[in-house]
Amino acid sequence: MVEAEVEVDVEIKSTADKFFMFSRRSQHASKATRYVQGCDLLEGEWGEVGSILLWKLTVDGEPKVSKDMIEAIDMKMNMIQWRVLEGPLKEEYNIFSKTMKVSPKQGGSGSVVKWNLKYERIDEKVAHLERLLQFFVECVNEIDQYLLSEG
C-alpha cells in the first residue's frame, strides 16, 4: 500500500509555548479533555524522546488504547512526533505516526496547532483518516479552553 498523509490546522487562543509545554506533559491531558481518560508512562521519562506512553482514549464514543513512542521533539519549533506501536490503529495501518506543531499566529494573538498524520493502510478497505482529524480538533479546542481557564 501507499503511504498517505492528512493534516489539519486549529486556531487557538493560548500561546504556542503554553500549549506545547502542556502537550509535552501528557500525564495531565485527562484534566483538560474528555477524550483522554489517562496516559501512563511505560518507559523513559515524561516528555522525552524514546519514551513509551499508553494512552487511554475515547474515540467516536468507544474506549481505545494506543501505545505510542515519542520519536522527536523540537523545542524551538514546538513540535512533537509520536509513532503508534500498538492498539487499534496498528490493526488497520502498517505505519501510523502523528506530529503536532504549535506556532504563534501570524498577525494576531493566539496560536495555530497543526496535526499531521502519516499512515499506510493495511488494505484498500481501511478508511482514510479524515474522521480522526476531527478527534484531534476537538481535543485541541478542549485543551485550549482548559489552559485559558487556568490563567
From Swiss-Prot:
Which PANTHER family has this protein been placed in?
MLP-LIKE PROTEIN 423
One Pfam family cited in the UniProt record for this chain: Bet_v_1
**InterPro entries, sorted:** Bet_v_I/MLP (IPR000916), MLP-like_ligand-binding (IPR051761), START-like_dom_sf (IPR023393)
Q: Name one GO biological process term.
A: defense response
- Give the source species: Arabidopsis thaliana (Mouse-ear cress)
Q: Can you name this protein? A: MLP-like protein 168
Family named by the database record: Belongs to the MLP family.
